[in-house]
Design a protein with these regions (language model features):
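Active-site cofactor/cluster-binding pocket
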Residues: 20-25, 31-116, 120, 127-156
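Long, charged alpha-helical interface segments
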Residues: 152-182
Length: 182
């Protein structure tokens, strides 16, 4: 690893999915993150990956993450709205959404934004410049290489941006802008 200091990674685990398929639990078993079942025991500073946030993650967020933690919400996509609502009321973490990426996991392969917890955490680390740690986070998964292959050009582009605005514009160079944004 060439990263100077490993980023502290946590997942708020709401126990809503099949534990055998849970990527956060697998990462915890490998010692790569800590799962928290109580929101009150999660990190108090840092970034919460929130798929409903309006603020994009950018390389500028590295300081927030280094000074605190990178925290993912590990829950069912079917219950995402209620899960985010509960978490957002009880944490002071800064919410960030990832720019558009494609899932590489077998359940949601190729779908925009429908990433597993491991994919979302890895993408976040990659975007903020912690590429070695990002890649190592995916090594326990057969789909890890597929995720990186699908998104390498996007991840490189996003990680080269200097602001959230640049990240937002960059995603529209790769994907069609929703008609409501035009």
């Amino acid at each position: 690893m060439t990263d100077i200091k490993k980023i502290r990674i946590e997942a708020i685990h709401l126990d809503q999915d099949d534990p055998k398929k849970c990527t956060a639990k697998k990462l915890e078993r490998r010692g790569l993150l800590r799962c928290k079942t109580r929101i009150s025991s999660a990190a108090k500073r840092g970034i919460l990956l929130d798929p409903l946030s309006e603020t994009l993650l950018s390389p500028n967020d590295l300081n927030l993450i280094e000074d605190g933690s990178l925290v993912a919400l590990d829950c069912s996509w079917k219950r995402i709205n209620e899960s985010v609502r509960i978490i957002s009321k009880t944490t002071r973490l800064e919410s960030r959404i990832l720019p558009i990426l494609l899932a590489g996991n077998p359940v949601s392969w190729g779908k925009r934004g429908r990433m597993s917890t491991a994919e979302a955490l890895s993408a976040s680390l990659y975007i903020v410049g912690r590429k070695d740690q990002a890649i190592s986070l995916l090594t326990p998964f057969k789909f890890g290489d597929a995720f990186l292959d699908l998104n390498r050009q996007l991840l490189e582009a996003y990680s080269s941006c200097n602001s959230q605005t640049e990240v937002e514009e960059m995603q529209w160079e790769f994907f069609d802008r929703p008609s409501s944004d035009i």
